[in-house]
Amino acid sequence: MNSETNSLSTRRHALLLATVQEFIATAEPVGSQQVAAHYSLGVRSAMVRSMMAELEESGFLTQPHVSAGRIPTDKAFRYYVDHLLVSSRIAFEDRAQIELHYSGRSRGLDDVMRDTPKLLALLTGQAALVMAPRLEAMTIERVSFVRLRERQVLGMFVATADRVENRLVETDRDFKQDELDRIAGYLNESLAGRTLDEARRWIERELKEQRAAYDQFRRDALALGGGAIGEKGDRTEVYIEGRVKALDQPEFTDPERVRELLRALDDKSALLALLERSIQQNGLMVSIGSENYDPRLACLSVIAASYATGSESVGSLAVVGPVRMDYDRVIPLVGYTARTLTRLLEH
C-alpha cells in the first residue's frame, strides 16, 4: 500500500470500503443516501455526500454524470483488495467443495489440470485458467528405454506427479534391450532427483568436458539421455473454462468489446505471460483493470496463485472476471485451490 491510500481517515476508509462493496453487489453507481441507509457509518447522508466528493477528488471514485451516484476506480479496488488480503478467509462451503472435488480420486496429472478450471469456473461464475506444471521445473524420477526397431529407441522419463514423457530417439547404431536397461540404470543414478533443466545442463556439461571421449558406454548413455529429455522448448499447457461466464456481466454489453475480450482469453501466449507473473511473485497475485500488462484486459481483474513441488513454483491458476469481482470470496478460494494442488503434487 502506498502512503496515499494508507492515510485515509477511519470514516473515509469505512465509506470507501462500503461504496466498493455496494458497487460489487449492484453494478450500479452508488449514491450517498444508499450508502448511509445500508451501512453503519455513524454520519448523515449530507456528510457521506461530502466525503464521497473528497474521495472523487483523490481519484478513488468517479461520477458518470452530475445526477448519478459514484463508481469506484481501479485505485479504489486496489485499496479495497490490499485491506482484504490481511483478513480474508475461505468460505466453509467453498473449502468443502474443493476438498470433495479432489478427495478419494485416483487421477492422472492431466485430468487434474483439466478439471481444476472447471471447478473454479463453477464456484466463482468467472473464467478460470490453469497453467500445467512447467516441464522444465519438474523433477525426474526415473528414465527408461525400449528398443522399437533397428536404430530406433523410445526414450521415456517419469517426472513429478507421475507425469510421463516419451521421445522417439534415432540412434547411430542398433541397441539390444539389455544394453538399454544398463544405460537407463546409469542415467537414473545421475539424473533422478534433478529437474529437467538441471538434467539437460548435466548432460551438456559431461559432453563438453569430454569425459565420455574414450568410453563408448557413457557416450551412448549421454546421447540417449539427451534424446529422451529433448531440447528446451514451450511445452506448457494452459486450460481455460468459463470464458462466456466472465463476460456475462452488466459491464459487457458492447458486442465488439466482448469479441476483443474473447480473443484475449483465447491467446495462449498472453495467458501464459499472465500466469507466469504469479509464478515470479511466488504466491498470490491480484491484478486490477489498468494494472494488467495486456491492454485488452484493462476492464478485467485477475486473481492468480502459484502452486509448487517442494520449494519450486511449477505452475499457476487464475480466475478472470470484471473489475467488479467478489474479491472477498474469490481471493481466498484461489489461494486455497493452489495450496490443494501443491499438496496433490507432493503426494
Where are each of the predicted segments found?
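Residue-level marker of regulatory loop/turn positions in helix-turn-helix DNA-binding domains and
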Residues: 8, 28, 250
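A short glycine/serine-rich beta->alpha loop
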Residues: 2-4, 61-66, 324
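Short alpha-helical segments that sit at the start of domains
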Residues: 1-17
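Helix-turn-helix-type domain boundary/helix-start signal
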Residues: 5-6, 41, 70, 173
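N-terminal helix-turn-helix
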Residues: 18-21, 25, 29-85
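Intrinsically disordered, acidic Ser/Thr/Pro-rich low-complexity regulatory segments
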Residues: 82-318, 322-347
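Alpha-helical hairpin
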Residues: 7-8, 43, 72, 90
